[in-house]
Amino acid sequence: MADEKTFRIGFIVLGLFLLSLGTFLMSHDRPQVYGTFYAMGSVMVIGGVIWSMCQCYPKITFVPADSDFQGILSPKALSLLETGLSEVKSPQPPYVRLWEEAAYDQSLPDFTHIQMKVMGYSEDPRPLLAPELKTGASSVREGEPRTAQAWMEAPVVVHRGSDENEGEKSHSQSSPSVGPQGSAPLASFHDDLDVGSSEGSSLQPSPNRDEPHRQVPWASRGPLDRFSDFALIDDTPTSEDTVLDGQAREAALPRKQQWSLRMKGETVQARAEEPEQEEEDLYYGLPDSPGNPLPDKELGFEPDIQG
């Protein structure tokens, strides 16, 4: 290895010497001589540099796994390899035999005897909660001691919430009155009362506020109507709806009449106070006189009379 390194260095130095010799001969005007030295020196320098660069990388040696080539390695290297392999610990668990795995699978508990029963909220779960001792039927041969396999049953009772039961009851109560479901009806706001009636109702307190609210028992209360402000367009009105609409219109009509009479009185009073001259001053067209709209006296000339 040292001889090879020395040879590479000498090769590069010889190439540099040839380059310097060619430069010296070039000064004496001999082109056929210094060209040869230049070419040889450049080739030797480039080759030596590339050779040195290739030797900087580590060498890869392939060792065959055949037993015939074990004699090539020294006994010291073999001992080092054996000690290194013994020190390395494999992360894998030790090998488990198949019969041990089968025995472990058989030792696991069997959950086939578990049963599930759905109970309502009103049912009593105490009969199920009472522990029962059962003995499993095992095949017992004659002459062998009889071993009783016993286990305890621990039932888990899960009740459905009261909200679900109330929802089911309300659904069952409302289902007979509901007809066959078709297309979903449209919805709209109640616009029977106009703005005037709403303003009049806001000025006058409603008589319904003075009436005490009826106490409705909690049991008879159904789910809250969240869409009470909507009216179904496609839905056919029932008798109760028509009665309620008639009462609302009757209560709204006197308020509307009072408001309209008040507005009419105010407009008549305002018209009486305005002078008629102001109306004539604001008129920009021809006067509404039954006669000639353009009298001759205003024109300032007499029409020609041809007799």
From Swiss-Prot:
The keyword Transmembrane applies. InterPro entries: Barttin (IPR029181). Residues 161-171 have a biased composition (Basic and acidic residues). Residues 172-183 have a biased composition (Low complexity). Residues 1-5, 54-307 are cytoplasmic. Expression is evident in inner and outer stripes of the outer medulla of the kidney, most probably representing thin limbs of Henle's loop together with some collecting duct coursing through the outer stripe. In situ hybridization in fetal kidney at 18.5 dpc revealed a clear continuity between hybridization signals from the thin limb of Henle's loop and the distal convoluted tubule, suggesting that part of the expression pattern may result from expression in the thick ascending limb of Henle's loop. Palmitoylation is necessary for activation of plasma membrane-inserted CLC-K/barttin channels. One of its GO terms (molecular function) is chloride channel regulator activity. One of its GO terms (biological process) is intracellular potassium ion homeostasis. Residues 27-32 are extracellular. The chain crosses the membrane at residues 6-26, 33-53. Keywords: Cell membrane, Lipoprotein, Membrane, Palmitate, Phosphoprotein, Transmembrane, Transmembrane helix. It is found in: Basolateral cell membrane. It comes from the Eukaryota. Residues 1-72 are annotated as: Regulates channel membrane trafficking and anion conductance. GO terms for cellular component: basolateral plasma membrane; membrane; plasma membrane; protein-containing complex. A lipid is attached at residues 54, 56 (S-palmitoyl cysteine). It is a multi-pass membrane protein. The modification Phosphoserine is found at residues 79, 107, 162, 228, 289. Disulfide bonds: none annotated. Regulatory subunit of anion-selective CLCNKA:BSND and CLCNKB:BSND heteromeric channels involved in basolateral chloride conductance along the nephron to achieve urine concentration and maintain systemic acid-base homeostasis, and in the stria vascularis of the inner ear to establish the endocochlear potential necessary for normal hearing. Most likely acts as a chaperone that allosterically regulates proper sorting of CLCNKA:BSND and CLCNKB:BSND channels at the basolateral plasma membrane domain and functional switch to ion conducting state. Interacts with CLCNK channels. Forms probably heteromers with CLCNKA in the thin ascending limb of Henle and with CLCNKB in the thick ascending limb and more distal segments. This is Barttin. The lineage of its organism: Eukaryota, Metazoa, Chordata, Craniata, Vertebrata.
